[in-house]
Amino acid sequence: MTAASSLHPPAIPRVGFVSLGCPKATVDSERILTCLRAEGYLISPNYADADLVVVNTCGFIDSAVAESLETIGEALTENGKVIVTGCLGAKEDVIRQAHPSVLAVTGPQATEEVMAAIHHHLPKPHDPYLDLVPPQGIKLTPKHYAYLKISEGCNHHCTFCIIPSMRGDLVSRPVGGVLQEAQSLVEAGVKELLIISQDTSAYGVDIKYRTGFWQGRPVRTRITELANALGEFGIWVRLHYVYPYPHVDELIPLMAEGKLLPYLDIPFQHANKRILKLMKRPANSENVLVRIQQWRKTCPDIALRSTFIVGFPGETEAEFEELLAFLEEAQLDRVGAFTYSPVKGAAANVLPDHVPPEIQQERLERLMQQQEIISKQRLAVKKGQQLRVLVDTVDEEGAIARSYADAPEIDGVVYINDASTLKPGDWADVRVTDTDIHDLWTEKI
């Protein structure tokens, strides 16, 4: 090494990163960022200072495709060197047609391919003594909660969805690896784990629920056994994307025991048997209502969230009203709904009798108006109750927290009027003073 080179060592390469899409994509981004930091790359907060930019895209619906393509274009304009990954990356021709100058394109869950592309265009720094990576990896979420992905892909072929064609069939992570990651997160200060996958309740079915090992003891690769083990960490464990298999009923006693949060994110999608069959979804709303009653009997505090599609091809007014009747009887706590939108490659596109957009929108508004009344009534009974909440943010006006019934970003929040002694990540015991459609207002106890 010459004197000049020792005085002016090579600059550490910087990578810009943009993460779009759902929590599953967020976990993919976290894995790539963790690898980058482990190899000594710096993460640039802006395009200008980056040597190249990675864009993790979403391609689920048309608006997501448009946002992804726009973001790629922005990164090319501001930086010029862009690597594309994620769900839209499974359609390389779409990306290349819009932006032929991108350096490389990979599909989702392709950490090794992304890193190989980065190495090719921006060689990694050489400093074996530099330890940049915390044990829990690089996270895009606040320090007190984290998403934990337990599998990739999906074995279902719902006619409105193209995720299996982008992310492949179900591949479950080894149960020991999942629990090791959970332990690392807990040791790093995480107080809430949000368990995610394309189909959380199918965990282990691809490997016939093979028995794995965790700290020397056997644990089946199955959602009930995994949930039971996660419950031993003594933190909040929240389940998302739970397909309504019969064995989901086994999870409710764990919620009643306090091992899992009494919260179930379970997408029913519709209530009419014919529409559900066209969707290739479970088609027995009567059985669903019986199960909901049993869940509430076993765990009275359970909060139920679901999603629904309105205006699916062929949906009649009577079939839509059947969905409204189901919602009235089910009395779900949280509901998300959207109008059916044709997605390139989805089997439902070829179904006859597509519902006109204006009728779709009218039905969506009717559904949400009805559900708002239900949600408001279900929250109103909490007035005067005491709750333990997890604080997300604090400012001069107070604190914003979440209860067991509130997942980050998709549900309501809990406002605390006095935040003088609180900081993000704190637990707080509060009393509910007021409620509305989605949120609670509280005072510290």
UniProtKB/Swiss-Prot annotation:
Residues 13-123 form the MTTase N-terminal domain. It catalyses: L-aspartate(89)-[ribosomal protein uS12]-hydrogen + (sulfur carrier)-SH + AH2 + 2 S-adenosyl-L-methionine = 3-methylsulfanyl-L-aspartate(89)-[ribosomal protein uS12]-hydrogen + (sulfur carrier)-H + 5'-deoxyadenosine + L-methionine + A + S-adenosyl-L-homocysteine + 2 H(+). [4Fe-4S] cluster 1 binds at residues 22, 58, 87. Binds 2 [4Fe-4S] clusters. One cluster is coordinated with 3 cysteines and an exchangeable S-adenosyl-L-methionine. GO terms for molecular function: 4 iron, 4 sulfur cluster binding; aspartic acid methylthiotransferase activity; metal ion binding; protein methylthiotransferase activity. It comes from the Bacteria. Its cofactor is [4Fe-4S] cluster. The keyword ATP-binding does not apply. The keyword Cytoplasm applies. GO terms for cellular component: cytosol. Keywords: 4Fe-4S, Cytoplasm, Iron, Iron-sulfur, Metal-binding, S-adenosyl-L-methionine, Transferase. Belongs to the methylthiotransferase family. RimO subfamily. Catalyzes the methylthiolation of an aspartic acid residue of ribosomal protein uS12. This is Ribosomal protein uS12 methylthiotransferase RimO.
